[in-house]
Amino acid sequence: MYTLARQLLFKLSPETSHDLSLDLIGAGGRLGLNGLLCKAPASLPVNVMGLQFPNPVGLAAGLDKNGAAIDGFAQLGFGFVEIGTVTPRPQPGNPKPRIFRLPEAEAIINRMGFNNLGVDNLLARVAAAKYKGVLGINIGKNFDTPVERAVDDYLICLDKVYAHASYVTVNVSSPNTPGLRSLQFGDSLKQLLADLATRRAELALRHGKHVPLAIKIAPDMTDEETAQVAQALIETGMDAVIATNTTLSRVGVEGMEHGDEAGGLSGAPVREKSTHTVKVLASELGGKLPIIAAGGITEGKHAAEKIAAGASLVQIYSGFIYKGPALIRESVDAIAAKR
């Protein structure tokens, strides 16, 4: 069924297709239809970050930026759902067109630029959702906030989402917000993480609960830089790392239509880079905090490879667009088969 739906959706522009798909998944969720249309994945419970997941396969941030289809995605069988990236204030993102399909490579290039309706709008949708499972909220900075003041935006978002999120992801790795990736390095990263840890401690006292903080990083760092990130995460008491965001590399898409578009490349071509980053992190972290792997999972075996590389959970986005909900079940089955 999804193969036919994809053929129809791919006749539309990528962003129109995305918006329509989100509307359909959201409507299906409100009507309780999505679970009837998709065979549920097997139960494969796992405890990560002190949270109980029914299975280790989640939705990556970016597909549902505003929390418009939380119930719909949950009904498809995801073990957890991550929404966002959300910013303190609404912003339109970059000019269109800003999403490009590369179907021959099972890849997508996007330069969306954190388009979203703002954190208050997102929280209203979270409140309206019936979903009671693990919900991650991914936070970022507004485009017009100077990078040296980025921490202000992260703290505003953390304050607002804390009571409503199972965990919070801090996005410092999108390539589409100028200067953002500089926050992954050296003293900038350590100061940001320290400020977040301090605020989280205050919020934990206020709300009477500990909400885990995850940091999402890029696949384009050297092994040494990745190792330095790992040490900073340990030193500041972060709870998890998500590896990885999209890549600026164009290896695997050279010469293809849209292959030279600006933005972050996701899908199959980023798989090896992302998995390598997972392996480096696993070596450096030594089990001190868990890794959530994202990047290039287009078949179930790729999810199992991420777990074998050292991840505790996986997330899918581009693979979901190309393969549909069946990829969730296929990934859970592949992970279970390797246990």
From Swiss-Prot:
PROSITE patterns: DHODEHASE_1. Keywords: Cell membrane, Flavoprotein, FMN, Membrane, Oxidoreductase, Pyrimidine biosynthesis. One of its GO terms (cellular component) is cytoplasm. Its EC number is 1.3.5.2. InterPro entries: Aldolase_TIM, DHO_dehydrogenase, Dihydroorotate_DH_1_2, Dihydroorotate_DH_2, Dihydroorotate_DH_cat, Dihydroorotate_DH_CS. It comes from the Bacteria. The active site is at S174 (nucleophile). Binds 1 FMN per subunit. It catalyses: (S)-dihydroorotate + a quinone = orotate + a quinol. It is an enzyme of class 1 (oxidoreductase). Pathway: Pyrimidine metabolism; UMP biosynthesis via de novo pathway; orotate from (S)-dihydroorotate (quinone route): step 1/1. Its cofactor is FMN. Substrate binds at K65, N110, R111, M112, G113, F114, N171, N176, N245, T246. FMN binds at A61, G62, L63, D64, K65, T85, N138, N171, K216, T244, G267, G296, Y317, S318. It is found in: Cell membrane. It is a peripheral membrane protein. GO terms for biological process: 'de novo' pyrimidine nucleobase biosynthetic process; 'de novo' UMP biosynthetic process. CDD domains: DHOD_2_like. GO terms for molecular function: dihydroorotate dehydrogenase (quinone) activity. Monomer. Belongs to the dihydroorotate dehydrogenase family. Type 2 subfamily. Catalyzes the conversion of dihydroorotate to orotate with quinone as electron acceptor. This is Dihydroorotate dehydrogenase (quinone). It comes from Pseudomonas fluorescens (strain Pf0-1). The lineage of its organism: Bacteria, Pseudomonadati, Pseudomonadota, Gammaproteobacteria, Pseudomonadales. The gene is pyrD.
